[in-house]
């Protein structure tokens, strides 16, 4: 086992604090609408330019092991805030640095670290409660656009596209961000339910120009197993032909004689039909077939449920206003399922998302939820160079998470002002001793840090801005760093999601509290490389 180096008390805290400062100072320059860029060297390819706090934090690794521990603890703040709220990583880092600095001073002056931490926790609890009470629900499309614009560092175009995407697919819909081949931002919205399965034979195509199958007001037959023989299907096929409506068959597979018979009937013009494979695999396939059944008001033909193909009636079939099938995808628009059934299924999937511990399962469940509840929107981000595209994509990702957070828990005045306004919640908090009272005062001072940093990044004096904000008690009154004006931040469109502000403060205080209460640090001793031995002379004469 390698030898370890141990540092205690002030020596440990000083080394750790240096690491915290290096990390925070690199991240904090990106805060606010006039935040600066950070250039990150890559081992291959062009350097990456970003204004995303968590991206900067993830790149920092320090040579000194003890300093690095402090930096990595601060990186944890950014990562946790990013995971919970998707944005606010720089705010969380700035808050954590402020709490750690003030806490370290208090510990150095002889106060009990555990009581300080208890005081910090009491203060954060009170502030979070006050933030929740003051959050305003997001109702208008314009407010969503404002949240997205702020999070995208003032890019109104990104804000507009995200608001449009949210409006079209709803709060439960899936919005994905991809890199575009052009220099513009593009939005593509897929209506209805789409899954990655195309037609089983090109002979089913009805629109030769677009090379796809288009069925209007169609029936849908959902079968869990393979179809290789149509004998059992003849009664239901005859009923469909009499109705004069098209039919889409979704089964594990349609092969051999069954597929040939369907193609021949389609070509002869007797039957408007198409067949596709069921999406997914194993148990996920069963769940997705059930989703399609609920969306279209049909029933999955499954022997496990005691439903046989030969006993199928028209009531078993699903219905949809429009179905489009191309080589790789099938889209079902406007299914005939009842709103109550779809709502019940959505609630069931949401419960599964809450329970699952697997990121992969959660992602797949969210995809299913989107297909049932809203739709899928794809935002394609373009730019002149690869570096620009990546930087813009980072900002769109941040903005997307911020808008979701705003819809979830509401909005607050932006620019760090919300934290300043709820400081009154700390007045009169009951504490067990003076050290806990100092912990509360640490948080009172620390929550000014985001406003000060935003002001400094915009070229203003932080203490002057904080002083002017304190002169007025109006909750929404603040400073717009983009324009340099004071006024109602809600009206100016400078707003932050309540979830982002809350998560930033909670995560910052959590990690900062641990750093303040650290009394010893252990790291591996760096290995000293000795001088290599001189090679033997090999019989040379001197």
UniProtKB/Swiss-Prot annotation:
Subcellular location: Cytoplasm
GO biological process: protein refolding
CDD domains in UniProt: GroEL
Domain of life: Bacteria
Catalytic activity entry: ATP + H2O + a folded polypeptide = ADP + phosphate + an unfolded polypeptide
Binding-site positions, ATP: 30-33, 51, 87-91, 415, 496
Residues of the signal peptide: none
Chaperone is among the record's keywords: yes
Induction of its expression: By heat shock.
DNA-binding listed as a keyword: no
Catalytic class of the enzyme: isomerase
Keywords: ATP-binding, Chaperone, Cytoplasm, Isomerase, Nucleotide-binding, Stress response
Record GO terms (molecular function): ATP binding; ATP-dependent protein folding chaperone; isomerase activity; unfolded protein binding
Similarity-based family: Belongs to the chaperonin (HSP60) family.
Subunit description: Forms a cylinder of 14 subunits composed of two heptameric rings stacked back-to-back. Interacts with the co-chaperonin GroES.
Protein name: Chaperonin GroEL 2
Record lineage: Bacteria, Pseudomonadati, Pseudomonadota, Alphaproteobacteria, Hyphomicrobiales
